[in-house]
């Protein structure tokens, strides 16, 4: 069940949802706004002939930090990784979903391509999959609102929450935009 602002504040007060830094002004009727950090991962398209999810490709992306009060310019058709300014930690019976902001979507900014779900037990910065589908560059200002987290109460605590190691925990504790680690547990069914 999606939880309300009142319940979000109660879960934050009891430390079952932890957002650091926490700004009470970011709480909305059924979500909490999150801001973008100053770190981005850009794809180096000339390092590999193709992307292979089964292989480790350590030079596929490079980390860039925006300096001072400058924006990051996301060009039309460009895809980069960013991350939330906030660290997010969830109790074993709370999951979250990252959604974009309508006002930014109307400008052509997609906040996440596919990975908007955050498992119970997760702790770390949330990696953003940012795409510009507009025809003009978009300025991304560190500290600006970039999305919103909606929280869900599970019917019971997860038997193996994220970070327990049972189902994998490749991104537990991540800081900044984290490149894909799909090669670590790549699965392919022979068909």
Curated annotation (Swiss-Prot):
<comment type="subunit">
    <text>Homotrimer.</text>
</comment>
<dbReference type="InterPro" id="IPR033704">
    <property type="entry name" value="dUTPase_trimeric"/>
</dbReference>
<dbReference type="InterPro" id="IPR036157">
    <property type="entry name" value="dUTPase-like_sf"/>
</dbReference>
<feature type="binding site">
    <location>
        <begin position="101"/>
        <end position="106"/>
    </location>
    <ligand>
        <name>dCTP</name>
    </ligand>
</feature>
<keyword id="KW-0546">Nucleotide metabolism</keyword>
<feature type="binding site">
    <location>
        <position position="162"/>
    </location>
    <ligand>
        <name>dCTP</name>
    </ligand>
</feature>
<dbReference type="GO" id="GO:0008829">
    <property type="term" value="F:dCTP deaminase activity"/>
</dbReference>
<comment type="similarity">
    <text>Belongs to the dCTP deaminase family.</text>
</comment>
<feature type="region of interest" description="Disordered">
    <location>
        <begin position="165"/>
        <end position="191"/>
    </location>
</feature>
<feature type="binding site">
    <location>
        <position position="174"/>
    </location>
    <ligand>
        <name>dCTP</name>
    </ligand>
</feature>
<dbReference type="GO" id="GO:0033973">
    <property type="term" value="F:dCTP deaminase (dUMP-forming) activity"/>
</dbReference>
<dbReference type="Pfam" id="PF22769">
    <property type="entry name" value="DCD"/>
</dbReference>
<feature type="active site" description="Proton donor/acceptor">
    <location>
        <position position="129"/>
    </location>
</feature>
<protein>
    <recommendedName>
        <fullName>dCTP deaminase, dUMP-forming</fullName>
        <ecNumber>3.5.4.30</ecNumber>
    </recommendedName>
</protein>
<dbReference type="GO" id="GO:0006229">
    <property type="term" value="P:dUTP biosynthetic process"/>
</dbReference>
<keyword id="KW-0547">Nucleotide-binding</keyword>
<feature type="site" description="Important for bifunctional activity">
    <location>
        <begin position="116"/>
        <end position="117"/>
    </location>
</feature>
<keyword id="KW-0378">Hydrolase</keyword>
<dbReference type="GO" id="GO:0000166">
    <property type="term" value="F:nucleotide binding"/>
</dbReference>
<comment type="function">
    <text>Bifunctional enzyme that catalyzes both the deamination of dCTP to dUTP and the hydrolysis of dUTP to dUMP without releasing the toxic dUTP intermediate.</text>
</comment>
<feature type="binding site">
    <location>
        <position position="148"/>
    </location>
    <ligand>
        <name>dCTP</name>
    </ligand>
</feature>
<feature type="compositionally biased region" description="Polar residues">
    <location>
        <begin position="171"/>
        <end position="183"/>
    </location>
</feature>
<feature type="binding site">
    <location>
        <position position="119"/>
    </location>
    <ligand>
        <name>dCTP</name>
    </ligand>
</feature>
<dbReference type="InterPro" id="IPR011962">
    <property type="entry name" value="dCTP_deaminase"/>
</dbReference>
<dbReference type="GO" id="GO:0015949">
    <property type="term" value="P:nucleobase-containing small molecule interconversion"/>
</dbReference>
<comment type="pathway">
    <text>Pyrimidine metabolism; dUMP biosynthesis; dUMP from dCTP: step 1/1.</text>
</comment>
<dbReference type="GO" id="GO:0006226">
    <property type="term" value="P:dUMP biosynthetic process"/>
</dbReference>
<feature type="binding site">
    <location>
        <begin position="127"/>
        <end position="129"/>
    </location>
    <ligand>
        <name>dCTP</name>
    </ligand>
</feature>
